Amino acid sequence: MLKKIIFGIIIPLLSTGCFANSTTSNFSKKDVAKTNDVSTQKIIDDFSAYAGTIKPEVREEIQKYRVEIVDINKKKRELYNKLSKEAQNFLAEQQKYKQKLSIPKLLTENHPNNNANANANSKDNNDKDME
């Protein structure tokens, strides 16, 4: 269901995007590249200005943090590679199932009717507790 909704939204957007690209526009590719370069450079300049306000102690702390994260990720890869092929396959399948579960769970949590039913049930339970 979610896939149908996503594809229903993405395909028209992609097709209109392709159509817009195939028609003539006010900007050439060079103009767009210049605009992207200018906005990219502005972002870089803004970040450089912000980074200049950070204390050296904080920078060192962040650098140590990143080094430790790299070490942790290396250790995780080593542990994973030590697993048997069967165990690695199991973990891969488990991840697929977790991903399948997370999408419907989000849909039911955000669906207004389910929230209304949950609120009604909790109200009924509260009323029973008071009796």
From Swiss-Prot:
Annotated signal peptide: 1-17
Main location: membrane
Annotated GO CC locations: plasma membrane
Coiled-coil ranges per UniProt: 57-102
Membrane-topology annotation of the record: Lipid-anchor
Entry annotated with the keyword Signal: yes
Keyword Lyase included in the entry's annotation: no
Residues linked to a lipid group, S-diacylglycerol cysteine type: C18
This protein's UniProt keywords: Cell membrane, Coiled coil, Lipoprotein, Membrane, Palmitate, Signal
Lipidation (N-palmitoyl cysteine): C18
Region annotated Disordered, chain positions: 102-131
Cellular location(s): Cell membrane
Low complexity composition bias: residue spans: 113-123
Name recorded for this polypeptide: Uncharacterized lipoprotein RT0080
Organism field: Rickettsia typhi (strain ATCC VR-144 / Wilmington)
